[in-house]
Amino acid sequence: MRKQAIVCVLLLGAALAFAASVRAQQIEITEMAGLAQIFGEAQNNDVPLSMNDMDMVSGGYLLYETEVEANGEEAVLAVENIRDYAAVYVGEKRYGELSDTHKELTLALPEGTHKLQLYVENIGRITYGPEILDNTRGLWGVITYADNELDGWTMTPIEVKECVVGELIYEAFKPTEMPGFFKGTFSLDASREVHLNMSGWGMGEVWVNNEFVGTYWENNLQQSIQVPAGNLKEGENTVVVFELKNNGNSSLSLSDKIVFK
């Protein structure tokens, strides 16, 4: 009985030590990779093409680009149809988001011609309600800026689902507002389940040791991603984050439990 008690104490001590080491670990982003490496074949069209029009049957990510003329005053960017979400960038600066419930965004742009980039994600298929038979995804219909219809669109698939993150070409990390892949490392004394705390990050996907482990979104109640022990190893582990809505984070952390808002 005494021997069993000692074993239990030792096991409990090891578990507590592991949990403490996990809680203490901050994962610094040290490398980054641009999205151009995983661009699919682009298509040009006068009006925006939906993901369905682009033969993206399983949804995913699609970049919409055109030019806007600004007079230096605030003006509204408005989309007729969007499913489900778009991060709005102008000149490599993030200005905000659009969604199927928030279809307008006020932009304060300097006077001149600017490249408008809308990084669109389809979150999932409609499985209930009056729109169940309409699973159009992406952007379609009229898009205006300052009440002027925008034309001359380029649509480029972003092949996140097909890419192998370990084969991307990375460079040293530097602060950016653009979407991309962001890499860091962390160490474990033993291979056990952990949780990646994604609090503060925007929206995207995560890989650990080149294996996909999950997605995150700042609007979700749960802010962590479970990483099974089978995806981990003793010693150094690599994490890669694909961030669509870049909040400017340069680190994430480990947790020994699920993290909620």
Q: Which functions belong to the PLM regions below?
A:
Residues 103-109, 223-230:
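Exposed aromatic-hydrophobic patches
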Residues 1-9:
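Bacterial N-terminal signal peptides that target proteins for export
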Residues 8-17:
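Bacterial N-terminal signal peptides
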Residues 122-123, 202-219, 231-261:
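C-terminal functional regions that serve as terminal interaction/effector modules
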Residues 121-151, 246-261:
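Glycine/proline-rich low-complexity spacer/linker segments in large multi-domain proteins
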Residues 18-24:
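Sec/Tat signal peptide C-region and signal peptidase I cleavage site
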Residues 74-89, 116, 186-209, 216-217, ...:
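Aromatic-lined ligand-binding clefts that engage carbohydrates, nucleic acids, or primary amines
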Residues 24-133, 163-168, 244-246:
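Carbohydrate-binding surfaces of carbohydrate-active enzymes
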